[in-house]
């Protein structure tokens, strides 16, 4: 599917970049994970028929081609407010939010905010991939990023290619899929201006104590939800997906075999197959690998 760039101005001038394509009646809004961008979806987008779906690939604030203001406001709550504002201002309807990792957490928070504020929210379904839904211990590198002195130093001292190598080795289960082209795509992105600040600011906004009782809130979300998880994910373990399946009352869970943290990159065909019937609204009941 061919996509074109667009821009949305949030809160008096914060530029939010997105790419969109397709002319179908159902709108799919994709939300990437931490330190990623709209390019993370390049492997799976071609599977979506342009006559059935309209696709919007958002760059969240501070990531990709979106603005990176040094305002410290990079919490999941803030990102969720931006998503809601985007949906409202663009007058979207029949929306499915598709979130990976951090983006899944943002999708969930957007739903909870709309429920709390009793605001009409034209989201019909959720697709949550290896979702950052609960408090968990951050990887060592991210914990160090939070420190005032060591964090900025790490970003400057560690060569980008080493940082990328360590990242993709943890993200991908099948190391043969880390092609030179994919590796260089990650390197180009990590060298982007302003990303170092965004990464530090985002990590500093993570406060696990605020999410201690989040499971009880998720039970308020009645939307049909498809939870997709890589069987060998070492970033957000499979048990998190099973817990989320228990907490979301209208959810189904599909486990993608021989797959790490990024099913949409590592197993795009299998991931799309898991999504196809769900997005068409044919059924919700659990099938295949899901319980």
Q: What do these predicted ranges mean?
A:
Residues 1-28, 50-53, 81-84, 88, ...:
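Alpha/beta-hydrolase fold catalytic core
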Residues 11, 57-102, 119, 273:
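Active-site loop/oxyanion-hole signature of alpha/beta-hydrolase fold enzymes
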Residues 20-65:
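Conserved HGGG/HGGXW glycine-rich cap/lid loop of the alpha/beta-hydrolase fold
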Residues 112, 121-156:
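Flexible "cap/lid" loop of the alpha/beta hydrolase fold
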Residues 157-220:
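Conserved alpha/beta-hydrolase catalytic His-Asp/Glu region
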Residues 232-236:
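Acidic catalytic loop of the alpha/beta-hydrolase fold
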Residues 251-291:
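Catalytic active-site module of serine/aspartate enzymes centered on a nucleophile-bearing elbow/loop
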């Amino acid at each position: 599917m061919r996509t074109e760039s667009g821009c949305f101005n949030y809160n008096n001038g914060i530029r939010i970049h997105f790419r969109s394509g397709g002319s179908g009646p159902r709108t799919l809004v994709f939300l990437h994970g931490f330190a990623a961008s709209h390019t993370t979806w390049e492997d799976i987008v071609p599977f979506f028929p342009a006559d059935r779906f309209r696709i919007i690939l958002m760059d969240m604030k501070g990531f990709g081609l979106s603005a990176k203001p040094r305002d410290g406001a990079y919490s999941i709550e803030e990102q969720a407010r931006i998503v809601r504002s985007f949906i409202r201002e663009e007058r979207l309807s029949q929306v499915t939010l598709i979130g990976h990792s951090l983006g899944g957490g943002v999708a969930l928070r957007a739903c909870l905010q709309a429920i709390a504020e009793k605001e009409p929210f034209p989201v019909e379904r959720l697709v949550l991939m290896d979702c950052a839904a609960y408090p968990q211990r951050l990887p060592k590198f991210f914990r160090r990023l939070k420190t005032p002195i060591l964090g900025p130093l790490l970003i400057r001292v560690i060569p980008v290619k080493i940082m990328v190598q360590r990242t993709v080795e943890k993200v991908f289960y099948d190391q043969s899929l880390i092609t030179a082209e994919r590796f260089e795509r990650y390197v180009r992105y990590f060298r982007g201006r302003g990303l170092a600040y965004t990464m530090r600011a985002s990590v500093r906004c993570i406060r696990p104590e605020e999410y201690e009782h989040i499971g009880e809130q998720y039970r308020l979300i009645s939307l049909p939800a498809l939870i997709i998880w890589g069987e060998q994910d070492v970033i957000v373990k499979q048990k998190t997906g099973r817990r989320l399946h228990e907490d979301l009352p209208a959810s189904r869970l599909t486990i993608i075999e021989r797959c790490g943290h990024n099913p949409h990159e590592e197993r795009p065909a299998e991931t799309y197959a898991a999504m196809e019937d769900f997005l068409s609204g044919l059924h919700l009941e659990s099938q295949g690998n899901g319980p």
